[in-house]
């Protein structure tokens, strides 16, 4: 059994798209990032990689490489899954905490969990998804923290 932890954050700016858990969320603000800025998938990618000491998303997909400009974060997550599965691992569970002040994510919970279940190839009851606000401390950013449990 192995546990991995990952974390990611992005500044939010008016007029940019907001991707979370592989979905485009209706929002007046979105992540400033080299890729699509999906903090949830970036945190999950790092969590998977950390469980096997494989570095992090910046090592595998550096923001200095123009190939990754605007890339969907699903690409990064799929590669991290491939790398851990190549070591005989099987993802058992994933838990995420998303922190942002706006937009409110509650109305999108089912769609976000559905997307994670599809991307991670897990049943929905093996995905924890928690929403928090910064209580006004950091209203112009999104942060994601992820923990994964793997067998193998």
UniProtKB/Swiss-Prot annotation:
Pathway: Isoprenoid biosynthesis; isopentenyl diphosphate biosynthesis via DXP pathway; isopentenyl diphosphate from 1-deoxy-D-xylulose 5-phosphate: step 4/6
GO biological process, one term: terpenoid biosynthetic process
Enzyme Commission code(s) on record: 4.6.1.12
Catalytic function, reaction form: 4-CDP-2-C-methyl-D-erythritol 2-phosphate = 2-C-methyl-D-erythritol 2,4-cyclic diphosphate + CMP
Binding-site list for a divalent metal cation: 8, 10, 42
Transition state stabilizer, annotated site positions: 34, 133
The keyword Signal belongs to this UniProt entry's keyword annotation: no
Residues reported to bind 4-CDP-2-C-methyl-D-erythritol 2-phosphate: 8-10, 34-35, 56-58, 61-65
GO molecular function: 2-C-methyl-D-erythritol 2,4-cyclodiphosphate synthase activity; metal ion binding
Cofactor binding annotation: Binds 1 divalent metal cation per subunit.
Keywords from the named record: Isoprene biosynthesis, Lyase, Metal-binding
Cofactors required: a divalent metal cation
Role this protein plays: Involved in the biosynthesis of isopentenyl diphosphate (IPP) and dimethylallyl diphosphate (DMAPP), two major building blocks of isoprenoid compounds. Catalyzes the conversion of 4-diphosphocytidyl-2-C-methyl-D-erythritol 2-phosphate (CDP-ME2P) to 2-C-methyl-D-erythritol 2,4-cyclodiphosphate (ME-CPP) with a corresponding release of cytidine 5-monophosphate (CMP).
Quaternary state and interactors: Homotrimer.
Record PANTHER family: 2-C-METHYL-D-ERYTHRITOL 2,4-CYCLODIPHOSPHATE SYNTHASE, CHLOROPLASTIC
Family stated for the protein in its record: Belongs to the IspF family.
NCBIfam families reported in the protein's UniProt record: ispF (TIGR00151)
The name this protein goes by in its record: 2-C-methyl-D-erythritol 2,4-cyclodiphosphate synthase
Organism: Thermus thermophilus (strain ATCC BAA-163 / DSM 7039 / HB27)
Phylogenetic lineage: Bacteria, Thermotogati, Deinococcota, Deinococci, Thermales
Gene: ispF
């Amino acid at each position: 059994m192995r546990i991995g932890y990952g974390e990611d954050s992005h500044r939010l700016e008016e007029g940019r798209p907001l991707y979370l858990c592989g979905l485009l969320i209706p929002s007046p603000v979105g992540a400033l990032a080299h890729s699509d800025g999906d903090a949830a998938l970036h945190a999950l990618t790092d969590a998977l990689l950390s469980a096997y000491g494989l570095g992090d998303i910046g090592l595998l997909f550096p923001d200095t490489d123009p190939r990754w400009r605007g890339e969907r974060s699903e690409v990064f997550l799929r590669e991290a899954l491939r790398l851990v599965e190549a070591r005989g691992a099987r993802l058992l569970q994933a838990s995420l905490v998303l922190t942002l002040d706006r937009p409110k994510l509650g109305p999108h919970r089912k769609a976000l969990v559905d997307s994670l279940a599809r991307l991670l190839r897990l049943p929905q009851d093996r995905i924890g998804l928690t929403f928090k606000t910064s209580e006004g401390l950091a209203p112009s950013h999104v942060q994601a923290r992820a923990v994964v449990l793997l067998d193998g």
